[in-house]
Design a protein with these regions (language model features):
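Non-ligating segments of multi-cofactor redox enzymes
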Residues: 1-190
Length: 190
């Protein structure tokens, strides 16, 4: 039997993160851990250890593998053009979210208290934030970041169901960024 390590339970973190954000959107800021830690590990460790060992979302997808059809994922999922294109798309969405946060911070836009799936479909969770709890820009960032995290997790679960477990990992934007960092550190061509 395989020895269990503390990091084998990080899938629970993904569930806790979404549960906390469901009740108070300001907890969405905790998702920055999942955004920054893989980059730091790649920058300072030169490896994809986060993806391979510590990614709670990847572990959750593996746990949900029993719901998978176990079909081979399309080869283009792992192709450079798809991975880099998907990364560019997600970074664009992240940039728009940061810009919206800036507009709210500068007083040029009002707080949009909305969680959106796929950046289009508003989720009717009106109880996630009480106005005045934090600065409007802090809440705006939380709404946007939670939307991105929820959208990417739902995409991952759909892909996981249609194909093999962790098929999402083949084109995950964080995985693509950490792979790029590792290749650059090793002097390899992107």
């Amino acid at each position: 039997m395989k020895t269990k390590h503390w990091y084998d339970y990080l899938w629970i973190w993904t569930i806790v993160y979404f549960a906390l954000g469901f009740f108070n959107i300001l907890f969405a800021w905790l998702g920055m851990i999942d955004f920054l830690v893989p980059l730091f590990i790649a920058l300072f460790g030169g490896s994809k250890a986060f993806c391979n060992r510590y990614c709670g979302r990847g572990q959750l997808l593996a746990k949900c593998g029993k719901c998978s059809r176990n079909e081979k994922a399309p080869g283009f999922f792992a192709s450079k053009w798809f991975r880099y294109g998907f990364l560019a798309f997600f970074l664009s969405m992240f940039g728009i979210m940061v810009f919206q946060t800036y507009l709210v911070a500068a007083g040029a836009a009002d707080l949009r208290e909305a969680i959106k799936l796929l950046w289009m479909f508003r989720v009717p969770w009106g109880w996630t934030y009480t106005a005045g709890t934090a600065a409007d820009w802090v809440a705006q960032y939380a709404f946007g970041f939670y939307s991105i995290m929820l959208t990417s997790t739902i995409i991952g679960l759909v892909v996981n169901t249609l194909f093999k477990p962790r098929a999402w990992c083949s084109f995950c934007p964080m995985g693509t960024m950490t792979q790029m960092i590792c290749k650059l550190k090793a002097g390899e061509k992107l």
